[in-house]
From Swiss-Prot:
Residues 125-179 form the EamA domain. InterPro entries: Sugar_P_trans_dom (IPR004853), TPT_transporter (IPR050186). The chain crosses the membrane at residues 40-60, 79-99, 110-130, 135-155, 162-182, 218-238, 258-278, 279-299, 301-321. It comes from the Eukaryota. The gene is Slc35e4. This is Solute carrier family 35 member E4. It is found in: Membrane.
């Protein structure tokens, strides 16, 4: 995770830290927020974060490649239907695990999150069905920039100056990669751009619902959002894909096995994503998500024979350098301080 001081990060705490702080405040008769030693309170969190991040990265990379395989090899021209099946699988999987009903006070926020959730998934799958997998993944590298801007505007979060600096190589790398892969249709790129923006907005919404006053658990929140999203996506698939998409082959067992596996990976991916948001932050999740891009580029080359240009490889290098700067901003700041390039007493003035 990012090694920035808490005061320069996003002003957020994990649920484990919040419970410990509340108990400490009751014992001493006065509130204490934030705690003096957050690293002690959050000792169980690192292992959980690592496990959730690994599961999230593996499930996400596998699901993207499998979805592209379904669209390309099996000719499954119904991305909205596939998105609806993903949401139906999430609702069925989380039905018995939801711990409590969603409070009435946040029903509107949950419905808005469901709308964003379903729309981002639909746009992502529609874009993935029309553009190469490598380009679809490279487009997602700009998600941290949207997430940082939205978290600052909507939630008033503060960020370390070097985190803002890290957005430069992240987005420049995405721009170079996209410029080197202009063979994709404009409509597909448009859907990917919309999906990227909505993904950042969705993460900010999820982070607020999970980590603020209601503190919903991941299974309950996924169940609450999956049902409205399924209704939205199923209706869209019925209206937009019923008469235009080719008929489904009912006897193609390999296709339906891939669809079932895709639904399973979607449930695992969403649960891991929600857990990461509860343990870290929306911005950290999307910066980590850029690791998924590298894995999908390798899979795209192996499975679909994609070949990247030199400009795209330059973009990958810039993206990885931006990720390093974001996650090691305190290390970079201490190195710059020794060389007289960074003044810790004036955090607003950077490199």
């Amino acid at each position: 995770m990012c090694r920035c001081p808490l005061e320069h990060h996003e002003g957020m705490m994990t649920s484990a830290e919040a419970v410990a702080v509340a108990g400490s405040a009751q014992e001493h008769g006065r509130p204490k927020w934030p705690p003096d030693k957050p690293q002690v309170l959050g000792q169980p969190a690192p292992a959980r974060v690592v496990v959730a991040a690994l599961v999230w990265l593996l499930a996400g990379a596998s699901m993207s490649s499998l979805n592209k395989w379904i669209f390309t090899v099996h000719g499954f021209g119904r991305p909205l239907l596939l998105s609806a099946l993903h949401m139906l699988a999430a609702a069925l999987a989380c039905h018995w695990g939801a711990q409590r009903p969603v409070p009435h006070s946040i029903h509107r926020r949950v419905l808005l999150l469901s709308l964003t959730f379903g729309t981002s998934m639909a746009c992502g799958n529609v874009g993935l069905s029309t553009v190469p997998l490598d380009l679809a993944q490279l487009a997602t590298t700009t998600t941290p920039l949207f997430t940082m801007a939205l978290s600052a505007l909507l939630l008033g979060r503060r960020h370390h100056p070097l985190q803002f600096a890290a957005m430069g190589p992240l987005c420049l790398g995405a721009a170079c990669s996209l410029a080197g892969e202009l063979r994709a249709p404009p409509a597909g790129c448009g859907f990917l751009l919309v999906a990227t923006c909505l993904r950042g907005f969705k993460s900010v919404q999820q982070s607020g619902a999970l980590l603020q006053e209601e503190r919903l658990d991941t299974v309950t929140l996924l169940y609450a959002t999956s049902l409205p999203s399924f209704c939205l996506l199923a209706s869209a698939a019925l209206v937009l894909e019923a008469g235009t998409a080719p008929p489904l082959p009912p006897t193609d067992s390999r296709l339906w096995a891939c669809v079932l596996l895709s639904c399973f990976l979607s449930v695992v991916y969403n649960l891991a994503s929600f857990s990461l948001l509860a343990l870290t932050s929306a911005l950290t999740v999307h910066v980590l998500g850029n690791l998924m891009v590298v894995g999908n580029l390798i899979l795209s080359r192996l499975l679909f024979g994609s070949h990247l240009s030199a400009l795209s490889y330059l973009g990958i290098t810039l993206t990885l350098s931006g990720m390093f700067l974001y996650h090691n901003c305190e290390l970079v700041a201490s190195w710059a301080t020794r060389w007289g390039l960074w003044n810790r007493d004036q955090p607003g003035k950077g490199l």
